[in-house]
Amino acid sequence: MRRILTLLLLFNVVRSSEAITGGVVNLRPKQIINSVGIGDRFGGIGTSSDESDHFKLLAADGDSLLVGARNAVYNLSLSTLSVNHKIDWKPPAEHIEECIMKGKSKTDCQNYIRVLARKSAGVSLVCGTHAFSPKCREYTVTEFGIRNTRQFDGQGISPYDPKHNSSALYVPGTNQLFVATVTDFVGNDALIYRKTIDETPSSKSAANIRTQSYDARVLNAPNFVATFAYKEHVYFWFREIASEAIDNNEEPQIYARVARVCKNDKGGARPANERWTSYLKARLNCSLPSGSSPFYFNELKAVSDPIDAGNNNHVVYTVFSTPDSDVRMSAVCKFSMKKIREEFDNGTFKHQNNAQSMWMAFNRNEVPKPRPGSCSPDSTKLPENTVSFILHHPLLHRPIPSVAAPLLVEGADRADLTQITVLPRVRAVGGHNYDILFIGTSDGKVLKVVEVDGNATVIQSATVFQRGVPIVNLLTTKESVVIVSADEIASLPVHNCAQQTSCSKCVQLQDPHCAWDSSIARCVHGGSWTGDQFIQNMVFGQSEQCPEGIIVREVFDDNESEAQPEAVSRSGYPKEHSTITVVLVAAVASLISLIIGAFIGIRVNRWAATSEPHRSASSTSGSDYDSFGRARLTRHDSLTTATKVDHGFVPQSKQSVDATSLVMSINATHHPMSMSQHGSGINTPSRDKNAIVTSINQNTLPRDYKVKKVYL
């Protein structure tokens, strides 16, 4: 039943994507790059091949890249990925033994560094899992090297499990750390937490504030994806089980969320003095619209930093996917921070009267004032009804829609999209600026995508790691993109213009980094693009200025190494894989496999039911006779009875037809033919042809001739 429902959803995708995206899905890259083993690489130090470093990109500071790893923090050169400094921090042996006794593996019972913050010049905060007993340290750079100056409990700051999805943000100047993680050994108590880090152990701590424990209305088994500060708020992006939604099978649904808190939130009056008074969350809507039944991408996987979009607005690029199923899809959606702020500031709240009632919009006239969730100069003085309301109604009623339809949709025959980073406002020939997206996949590739007038073009697909190694972090600089897997880090250039050797192919890339220099006849990378010798067309990917003129464009299959000619439509654009083609092929394949599986199961059950009571040595595998000596009907045998065989030398008489039919194959010349020639699985005894015919004409068979009976 679940598979049939999945197929029905696929047809909904077809209808939605045909109407919204013009039938384009699985956009083919303009060029393919195999970068496995190429470029600067870092693979850890002192880690065996069967151990994982669980690399996590923590920060970029000038020319330094700070990476958390297994029992270590690496300070890498951003330009070469060589090691500038390394801090070793391994748990004591007794902590590892205690962790193992609690049921964890020796691999997990190490110290995986998950949080790092630069507090001030020369002082860094480092936190790790520390054998499922999180700890934090402050390291200070002195003239004698890097020294550990302080260690304290990291509960609520670092996760326990290195595989747990968590995020953290240090706000300079406030000495506060905003964290989204779990605070117990088994990972059930999820929280969004603000921790004030003391400069000295004796200094007075400000209020540490967190979300309520074990309250599904606030957080329900979340997977945290990203955290960043924007104006007076801190935003948390995650996915969780939606308390307000249950599907037709009464199974939990995963929804994508964005939540926010005020930076200056001091908590409420007692007993809510350690609870947020500004915590709100809303659902994110990344979907293919189709009337009353959109196709949703519900699972948030990655979020970019806010990108300046002009007009006092920023946008955020995100990666979504559908839940695990036979047909899994991914999408890239863009959200406006201005729209998000408007919904948080003015949106309707959602509420449920009791556990059995439906979730509904809360009556605006009954919302207390000041508005719950708004920032207050001193939240401890807020009215009790305002604080109580926000503790019980943190969810907004309306989902926050993406900016238009998804920019990019990857179908079931593609790898999942896992990470995203953006190189903003790249200048093209002519002075226009474009955002370039670098998107990681679950099979070790990085897609380079440009957005032109709201449409996505996949410029390049680069294979960075061996197939099956997911991309877990991405970082861009002006000239390079840093790609992180669990056990390897690579740095590659942001462009590969020199791969194209003709004007038409260079222009076809639609890459703002690349243009054809007619003065030297090369595809070059530039920044200022001064001069009129540069040929580029970001909108159509074709130019009459090229010596070749406008040619039939070539697109690349990302599974092949060579270009394949692609037909050009009347508009001049190449035809991509149609959504109807990709999705229907997947749907038909799934349906056929379902039917074949059911058919085989029925046949096996029938065979087992009939053969079990009569099992004997004679009923061996491969025999064409059952345990009673009766011939089995094979799939190669004809069911045509003797009365329907039209040949001249067999007399038709009632006596020659009874419940037992002789099955014989007659060729075009009306000569009896050995059944073995039809691949029946047995070899008919060699007989004289004339003797057989004579016997048949006399309505008899030779005594040693075997007859195959068919019971109808």
Swiss-Prot record:
Its main location: membrane. Residues 1-16 form the signal peptide. It is a single-pass type I membrane protein. Glycans are attached at N75, N165, N285, N346, N455, N559. The keyword Disulfide bond applies. The chain crosses the membrane at residues 582-602. PROSITE patterns: SEMA. GO terms for cellular component: plasma membrane. Residues 28-494 form the Sema domain. It comes from the Eukaryota. GO terms for biological process: axon guidance; negative chemotaxis; nematode male tail mating organ morphogenesis; positive regulation of cell migration; semaphorin-plexin signaling pathway. Residues 603-712 are cytoplasmic. CDD domains: Sema_1A. Gene3D superfamilies: ligand-binding face of the semaphorins, domain 2 (3.30.1680.10), YVTN repeat-like/Quinoprotein amine dehydrogenase (2.130.10.10). It is found in: Membrane. Residues 17-581 are extracellular. Keywords: Developmental protein, Differentiation, Disulfide bond, Glycoprotein, Membrane, Neurogenesis, Signal, Transmembrane, Transmembrane helix. Belongs to the semaphorin family. This is Semaphorin-1A. It comes from Caenorhabditis elegans. The lineage of its organism: Eukaryota, Metazoa, Ecdysozoa, Nematoda, Chromadorea. The gene is smp-1.
